[in-house]
């Protein structure tokens, strides 16, 4: 079952995509919600600083950190990518520190800087490659540098906006805000 962090942000939109795919899910609002039924986690878009504080005050930080450390699947979108990053280049906070990348918060600026694009997700020789995926950015981050453990999955205008590292999937964009379910399907296959 997929646990969706539901302390702030676009958790309802991720739940709607999983419903569309017939995949079971559970909202994670407090530590007691994270039980043995959770085998994968979604960290949704939203405001990363707020989510970081709420992860600690709800007691969810430790069980999610243990889940990630155990190599179980996790998918971070926008703020979720920030929460997963080993380092932020414009913020001293580090949250889970699991994704071998340096990420820039709010790299695409203010709300008015939000935009849409289309790109492929995955390497050209990857059998799971997703072509022509619609990307929705809302004040999104992007990746400033990628370490050797992570693999670039997609770029827009020369900026890395999608990464994979083992069972970690991270996007600067919001696939849950489109009608295309393929990236969620990829996550469910991990």
Swiss-Prot record:
SUPFAM superfamilies: Class I glutamine amidotransferase-like. It holds the Pfam family SNO. One of its GO terms (molecular function) is glutaminase activity. Keywords: Glutamine amidotransferase, Hydrolase, Lyase, Pyridoxal phosphate. Pathway: Cofactor biosynthesis; pyridoxal 5'-phosphate biosynthesis. Its EC number is 4.3.3.6, 3.5.1.2. L-glutamine binds at residues 46-48, 105, 138-139. It catalyses: aldehydo-D-ribose 5-phosphate + D-glyceraldehyde 3-phosphate + L-glutamine = pyridoxal 5'-phosphate + L-glutamate + phosphate + 3 H2O + H(+); L-glutamine + H2O = L-glutamate + NH4(+). Gene3D superfamilies: 3.40.50.880. The active site is at 78 (nucleophile), 174 (charge relay system), 176 (charge relay system). One of its GO terms (biological process) is pyridoxal phosphate biosynthetic process. Transmembrane segments: none annotated. It comes from the Bacteria. In the presence of PdxS, forms a dodecamer of heterodimers. Only shows activity in the heterodimer. PANTHER family: PYRIDOXAL 5'-PHOSPHATE SYNTHASE SUBUNIT SNO (PTHR31559), PYRIDOXAL 5'-PHOSPHATE SYNTHASE SUBUNIT SNO1-RELATED (PTHR31559:SF0). NCBIfam families: PLP_synth_Pdx2 (TIGR03800). This is Pyridoxal 5'-phosphate synthase subunit PdxT.
């Amino acid at each position: 079952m997929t646990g969706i962090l539901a302390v702030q942000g676009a958790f309802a939109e991720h739940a709607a995509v999983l419903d569309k795919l017939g995949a079971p899910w559970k909202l994670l609002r407090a530590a007691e919600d994270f039980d043995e039924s959770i085998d994968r986690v979604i960290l949704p878009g939203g405001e990363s600083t707020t989510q970081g504080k709420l992860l600690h005050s709800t007691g969810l930080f430790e069980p999610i950190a243990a889940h990630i450390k155990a190599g179980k699947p996790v998918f971070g979108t926008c703020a979720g990518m920030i929460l997963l990053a080993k380092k932020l280049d414009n913020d001293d906070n580090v949250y889970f520190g699991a994704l071998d990348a340096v990420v820039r918060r709010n790299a695409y600026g203010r709300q008015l800087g939000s935009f849409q694009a289309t790109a492929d997700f995955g390497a050209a020789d990857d059998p799971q490659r997703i072509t022509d995926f619609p990307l929705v950015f809302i004040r999104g981050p992007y990746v400033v540098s990628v370490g050797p453990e992570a693999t670039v999955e997609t770029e827009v205008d020369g900026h890395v906006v999608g990464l994979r590292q083992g069972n970690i999937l991270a996007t600067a964009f919001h696939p849950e805000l489109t009608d295309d379910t393929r990236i969620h399907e990829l996550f469910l296959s991990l």
